[in-house]
Amino acid sequence: MASWEKEKELAHLHQPEDDPLPDLSLLLDMDQFEPTEGPDSNPGAEKIYLQLQVAPGDPSEKTYKFGYEDKEAQNPDLKMRNWVPDPEKMSKWACARLILCGLYNAKKAKELLKMDYDIHWEQSKEDSQYFEIEYHCKMCMTVIHEPMPVSYDKKTGLWIKMGPLRGDIGSVVHTCRRHYERCMSALPSSGEPLKPRVRANPVRRYREKSLIVADRPKRSRWGVAPREQPNTSSGDAMALMPGPCGPFNMDPPGCLLERVPGSEPGTSEMALAMSGGPFWEQVYRDSISGPPTGPSEN
C-alpha cells in the first residue's frame, strides 16, 4: 500500500477540534514507538506529557484556567469567573471589597474580610447579568455560597444586590463565622469536612421568593391587615383610632370608669371594685386600701 493510501486511512483519527497537523505522516507507525520514550522522540505523547505535569498554584486558579478560560476566549463578552469590570481602575482586591459592601453594611463586610475567606464570583447560569458569590475556606477547602446574587451597574460603577429581600433570603455572615470558629478550634483531621446545606440556585431562589412576598398581604398603617376585621369585641375599629379610648391618648380613660360605681379615685367603692369585689375581701381579707388582715396560710 502506498504511503498516501495509509495517510487517507488514518485521516479519520484527526478530529476538527484537534490541533492542525502539518503532515499526517506523524500518525504513521505510531504503534512502533516505545511507551518509555520521552516527548522529544515521541511527537504523539508530547501533549499528554504536558497535561500530566502538575501545575503549581491554587486549585481554584487551575479550575479557572482549564474550565473558564477557553469559554471566555470563544466569547469575548462572556465574563464567567472573578470578573473585574475595569482592570485599569480596579483590581480583584478592590473588586471583592466593593462586592461585600454591596451585599452588606461596612461592619459585616469587615467581619467577613477578617475571617480571611477566598472570595470568588461566577456568572450565573440562570441570568448572565448576575454573579453568584462563593466563600472558600483556606483551612478545609469548604465552599459557602452567598444566597444573594449581585450585578454590576456600569453607570455608577458599583456592585448592587439583586433586590431588597435580604431578610427573606438570609445572610451568610453567621454561617461563615460559625464555620470559621469551628475550623480554628478543631484539631487537624484527615476526614472529609462538613459541608453547608445545599441551596437552590441563588437567582432562581430569589425570583421565587419575590413572587411569594408579592402575594403576601401587606399590613395597614394602624396595624390591621387589609380585608380583615379588627380584633375587638364589638367589631368596631374605634379602639384603633386616636381618641379618648384609643391607645394613642395619654389622658386618663374616664370613659371606662363611668359605669363603675364610685369611680372617683380614692373612694372605698373604687378600692373595693379594683381589689376583687366584696367576696374577695370577705374570704381573703385582702384589699388595696391596706395590708392583708388574714392569716398567711389563707
UniProtKB/Swiss-Prot annotation:
A motif (Nuclear localization signal) lies at residues 214-223. Its main location: host cell. Residues 1-46 are annotated as: Disordered. One of its GO terms (cellular component) is host cell nucleus. Disulfide bonds: none annotated. Residues 1-17 have a biased composition (Basic and acidic residues). InterPro entries: Foamy_BEL. Homodimer or homomultimer. Forms complexes with the host nuclear factors NFIA, NFIB, NFIC or NFIX. This is Protein Bel-1. The lineage of its organism: Viruses, Riboviria, Pararnavirae, Artverviricota, Revtraviricetes.
